[in-house]
Amino acid sequence: MATETLDKQKTIDLRKKHVGPSCKVFFDHDPIKIVRAKGQYMYNEKDEKYLDCINNVAHVGHCHPDVVSAGAKQMELLNTNSRFLHDSLVLYAQRLQATLPEKLSVCYFVNSGSEANDLALRLAWQYTGHKDIITLDNAYHGHVSSLIDISPYKFHQMAGAEPSQHVHVALSPDTYRGKYREDHPDPATAYAENVKEVIEEAHKKGHEIAAFIAESLQSCGGQVIPPMGYFQKVAQHVRNAGGIFIADEVQVGFGRVGTHFWGFQLQGEDFVPDIVTMGKPIGNGHPMSCVITSREIAESFMSSGMEYFNTFGGNPVSCAIGLAVLNVIEKEDLQGNALHVGGYLTQLLEDLKKRHPLVGDVRGRGLFVGLELVRNQSKRTPATAEAQEVIYRLKEQRILLSADGPHRNVLKFKPPMCFSREDAEFAVEKIDQILTDLEKAMVLQRPEAAILETGHIKRKDASDENGLVHPSNGNSHKHTSTIPLSKKTKRN
C-alpha cells in the first residue's frame, strides 16, 4: 500500500486553500484520492481498486515498467534542452515519422496538446499568410487563449461569448444528433458543403482561410465519428481557398482506433493532412507532445526569420519515454488489443441498446467508444441527469467513467490500451444493472423504440465544472444481469 502523509480531508482542505478554484477534480462532491496505479487500475488511499475506463493519458497502462525504466535511466544520465545534440531526439523523430505518410516528415517537440495545437496555428498563419481558422461545433483543442477561441466546447460555456471575427464554426459531422443524420444519402458531402459555405461567407467579409482544424474523432464533442470521405472533401474545399488541414490526434492517436495507428487514417489512404498534432498518450503520463508537418510548411516557418525554441520540448528524458511507449505498443500489440477488445466492448454495448430504452446510440472505433443516453429514442431527447447518475453509481462500483458531449449525456470509453475483455464485461454488466434500476425508477414504457419522457428522475440540476451532476440519494434496486457474458468477472 502506498504511504500518504495526509488524510483525504486534509488533502481536500489544502487543495481548496492553495489551488485555483477553477481547477476541478472528478466527482467534486466526493473526490477519489488516488495514491497509485498499475495497468488499467487505480488505487485509493485505502488500497481499493478502481477500473479506469477514461484515462487515455496512461496509454500503455499506468506505470508501465518499461516506460518507467526508460525515463529513470535517461534521467540518471542526461536531461537538458534541445539546443544540444543528443541521439534520442532524432531517433524518436524518425520512429514517429515512420508511422505517418511520407509527406509528414518534420517534427517540432513541445510539452502538451495545447502547445502543439497553438504551434500548428502559427505554422498555418505563416505558411498561408492568412488569419482565419475554421473549427467544428463542440470542438475542444486546448486551454491557451488562441485555442479557447477555436474551441466552441469551451467558449459556449461563457455567457454571451461569441467566436472571434477570425474564427468560423462549421457543423459537427455528427450523424446521430447533427443536421445530417444516418438516414441522409450522403452525410459526408452534406457536412463538407457546410464547410464550403463557411468559407464563402468568410470571403464575403474579406477574410481568408488559414486552416481548418478538427479532431480526427471528436472526443469532448461526444465521441463523434466523421462519415467516410468527409475529411477528403473538406480538405479540397479548404485547400482551394488557400488554407491547410490540421488533424488533431491529441485524444485518439497511437493505435487507439484499432485498425490504424492514427485516427485520420480511418478516412482512407487518399487523405493526408498538412499538419498532425499529438499529445496526451504520447508519453504515458509524462508531459510531452509533438507537431509533425511537411518540409514545405516547415521551411516557410523558418523563413519568418524567427527561431523557434522550446526549453523542455524534445528533452532526452521525454524522448526516451516516447520511444519506450512506441516500443510497448509494438511489443504488446496494443493496437491489435484495441481492435479486438474495442470491438467486443462495442458489441456488448450494442446488446445493451437492444434491451434498454435509455440507450440511444453506440458509436466508436477501437477503444474509443461512446454510449449516448436518451429519454426518448425517437426524439433523441438527451438523458443528461441519467448519464450523470450512471457515472456516479459506477464510481460506487469502483469503475471510473465520464460523460461528455454538448448535453453531457454520452458515456465515454477511452481506457488504457491494456483494457481486457474481462474488463469490458465487468463494466458493461454494471452499466446494465444501473440502467435497469434507472428505468424502473422512471416508470418507463417502451412502445416499439420510443420511451416516455414524463417519468424522468426528479433531482436537482447540480452540474459542476466537470459536467457531472450530483446524484440522488435513492437506493438502487437489486438486479440480476441478463447480459450474455462469456464468464462473470468478480472484482475485489
UniProtKB/Swiss-Prot annotation:
Keywords: Lyase, Mitochondrion, Pyridoxal phosphate
Secretion signal, residue range per the UniProt entry: none
InterPro entries named in the record: Aminotrans_3, Aminotrans_3_PPA_site, PyrdxlP-dep_Trfase, PyrdxlP-dep_Trfase_major, PyrdxlP-dep_Trfase_small
Family designation: Belongs to the class-III pyridoxal-phosphate-dependent aminotransferase family.
Pfam families: Aminotran_3
Record-listed N6-(pyridoxal phosphate)lysine modification sites: 280
Annotated source species: Danio rerio
GO terms, molecular function: ethanolamine-phosphate phospho-lyase activity; pyridoxal phosphate binding; transaminase activity
Main location: mitochondrion
Entry GO terms, CC: mitochondrion
Region (Disordered): 462-492
Gene Ontology biological-process entries: embryonic hemopoiesis
Protein name listed in UniProt: Ethanolamine-phosphate phospho-lyase
UniProt subunit comment: Homotetramer.
CDD domains hit by this protein: OAT_like
Highest taxon in the source lineage: Eukaryota
E.C. designation(s): 4.2.3.2
Places the protein is found: Mitochondrion
Record bears the keyword Lyase: yes
Cited SUPFAM superfamilies: PLP-dependent transferases (SSF53383)
Cofactor(s) the protein requires to work: pyridoxal 5'-phosphate
Record function comment: Catalyzes the pyridoxal-phosphate-dependent breakdown of phosphoethanolamine, converting it to ammonia, inorganic phosphate and acetaldehyde.
Name of the coding gene: etnppl
Reactions catalysed according to its record: phosphoethanolamine + H2O = acetaldehyde + NH4(+) + phosphate
